[in-house]
């Protein structure tokens, strides 16, 4: 076989498998829709890095331009490492994943420079994954395929319609670009992809994805069919109509935003509250940030402080929650990596779009733009699928066709690029070895959850202890471990585990569990303090008031006035959703009051 053909076969296979990351779903793992994709990415990266290493050893040397995008990525990665809380180590898996992404970026930059045909090939495969997702969604809507969420019929290979719609919105402008740029077969394929996505996208009911799709597709159409010259010509001919036209467009955009806001008003109000609280939290950590994985704890703390002021409204308290993500990637990066990290990340995205325009890669630039818009009101960068898509699209944007290098770019000499690629490939192998046991760990946790959900706590308690060191960064695991400890009478140990979970998550159930264990041990003052803190963070939840009522009814801690106040809250506050649990709590509180 011709050596070049072998290179192309190996690299195209590796790239295709990486682009298929969003389609992976491993049911035997806990959170297999995310962890399964991450494990797949690491496995394929091992193959891909070995292939690139083989290519670089057997191919004539190719000089690579070191661009501002490469430098910005390295600076942002350095910022993540510097701000990370190594003592707590809240996101070890994400750190390894980020390391692989950086390596992937530079390996991809090399092969796109060496083989210009991969620019189009990878975009084609990316569009194909979007088409597969769209058809998958159609099958789910018609009941021919199972959804991954009990409340939604449409999820594709994701766990809810939000990220699914976001991924389609990222692929859509790339498909439109193909339909506009090429002829015959490729144009037909592009329109088929666009049509399939447009059929499914409205059903996802994701306003963020709709906005991303409209902005990115509008830009791609303008870049391919209109451009600056035609725009300037139209402007010169219709100068007097420019201001009225802009005013009309602004009014239409405002009406569209208002309509989207009214579509899911409570959801929109909840996100506005998240952004406000996150903004206040950023003001408390403007330079150093909280570090990767520090968002949930910092958010919960700031929300408690905010609700303690007169500025907070009753409506905000009603829609409040304790989210894992900020539903705005820029705010979350600003909180976790500081304002400096946010500026660097924004510059990195901007540089991709800039180079994409300069290199006439409007499809890839449109995909990056769609992801950037979607990230304003969602959480795409918390999922591996979007990072893989971003790296592919970004690398295609910044890599100029062929091996020519502009004088303004720093060129990595052919003498040292073999060493650099070799070191990157070796680093990728090392990162794979670091995480290779995670698949079995999550598989075992999945089995343990089955036993746990059947309430066989004693049977599985030792298994949770065995996996503690490997999964102590997962608050869900720590909560389950603490529940097993609590049910087997090990309350002090359960509290120790939950205190760590509290630093990793804003989930109020963790605080409630700490309070229940402290009450069992007779630490009534600490129990009261924990519950009052939980109420401060989420003042409209009924459960902490119910726990307070039971606490104040304890003979050793009986306080009649506080008992009546807590009971009154349980009986009078309106829950978000009526349920059997609410009715049972109210009945029990009534009995407690009658006895006292």
Enumerate the language-model features and the residues they cover:
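TPR alpha-solenoid repeat register
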Residues: 477, 510-511, 544, 580
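Flexible juxtamembrane loops connecting transmembrane helices in multi-pass membrane enzymes
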Residues: 153-154, 213-217, 233-236, 245-286, ...
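Alpha-helical transmembrane segments of multi-pass inner-membrane proteins
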Residues: 8-24, 42-54, 77-85, 92-110, ...
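Interfacial juxtamembrane loops and adjacent helix segments
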Residues: 145-151, 292-335
């Amino acid at each position: 076989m011709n050596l070049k053909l072998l290179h192309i076969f190996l690299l195209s296979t590796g790239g295709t498998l990486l682009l298929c990351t969003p389609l992976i779903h491993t049911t035997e793992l806990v959170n297999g829709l995310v962890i399964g994709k991450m494990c797949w990415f690491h496995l394929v990266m091992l193959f891909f890095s070995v292939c690139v290493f083989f290519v670089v050893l057997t191919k004539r040397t190719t000089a690579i331009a070191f661009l501002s995008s490469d430098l910005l990525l390295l600076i942002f990665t350095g910022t993540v490492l510097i701000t990370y809380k190594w003592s707590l180590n809240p996101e070890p898996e994400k750190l390894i994943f980020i390391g692989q992404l950086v390596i992937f970026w530079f390996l991809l930059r090399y092969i796109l420079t060496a083989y210009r045909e991969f620019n189009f090939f990878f975009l084609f495969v990316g569009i194909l994954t979007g088409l597969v997702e769209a058809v998958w969604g159609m099958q789910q809507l018609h009941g021919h395929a199972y959804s991954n969420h009990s409340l939604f019929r449409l999820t594709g290979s994701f766990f809810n319609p939000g990220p699914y719609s976001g991924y389609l919105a990222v692929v859509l402008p790339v498909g439109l670009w193909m339909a506009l740029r090429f002829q015959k077969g490729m144009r037909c394929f592009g329109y088929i992809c666009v049509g399939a996505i447009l059929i499914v996208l409205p059903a996802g009911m994701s306003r963020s994805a709709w906005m991303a799709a409209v902005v990115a597709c509008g830009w791609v159409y303008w870049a391919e069919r209109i451009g600056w010259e035609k725009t300037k010509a139209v402007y010169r001919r219709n100068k007097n109509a420019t201001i009225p036209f802009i005013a009309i467009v602004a009014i239409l955009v405002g009406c569209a935003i208002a309509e989207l806001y009214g579509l899911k008003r409570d959801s929109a109000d909840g996100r506005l509250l998240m952004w406000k609280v996150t903004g206040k939290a950023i003001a408390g950590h403007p330079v150093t940030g909280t570090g990767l994985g520090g968002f949930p704890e910092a958010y919960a703390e700031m929300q408690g402080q905010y609700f303690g002021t007169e500025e907070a409204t009753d409506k905000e308290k009603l829609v409040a929650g304790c989210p894992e993500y900020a539903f705005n990637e820029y705010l979350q990066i600003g909180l976790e990596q500081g304002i400096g990290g946010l500026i660097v990340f924004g510059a990195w995205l901007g540089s991709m779009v800039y180079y994409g325009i300069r290199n006439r890669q409007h499809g890839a630039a449109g995909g990056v733009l769609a992801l950037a818009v979607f990230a304003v009101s969602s959480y795409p960068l918390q999922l591996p699928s979007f990072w893989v898509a971003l790296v592919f699209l970004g690398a295609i944007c910044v890599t100029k066709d062929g091996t020519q290098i502009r004088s303004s770019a720093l060129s990595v000499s052919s003498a040292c690029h073999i060493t650099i690629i070799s070191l990157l490939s070796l680093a990728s192998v090392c990162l794979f070895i670091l995480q290779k046991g995670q698949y079995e760990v999550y598989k075992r946790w999945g089995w343990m959850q089955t036993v746990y959900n059947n309430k066989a706590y004693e049977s599985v308690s030792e298994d949770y202890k065995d996996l503690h060191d490997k999964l102590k960064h997962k608050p869900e695991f720590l909560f389950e471990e603490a529940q097993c400890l609590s049910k087997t009478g090990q309350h002090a140990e359960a509290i120790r585990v939950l205190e760590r979970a509290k630093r990793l998550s804003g989930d109020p159930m963790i605080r409630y569990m700490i309070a229940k264990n402290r009450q069992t041990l007779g630490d009534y003052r600490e129990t009261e303090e924990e519950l009052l803190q939980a109420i401060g963070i989420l003042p409209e939840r009924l459960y902490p008031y119910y726990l307070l009522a039971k606490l104040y009814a304890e003979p050793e801690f009986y306080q009649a006035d506080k008992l009546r106040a807590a009971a009154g809250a349980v009986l009078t506050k309106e829950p978000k959703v009526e349920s059997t649990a609410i009715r049972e709590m109210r009945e029990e509180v009534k009995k407690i009051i009658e006895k006292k």
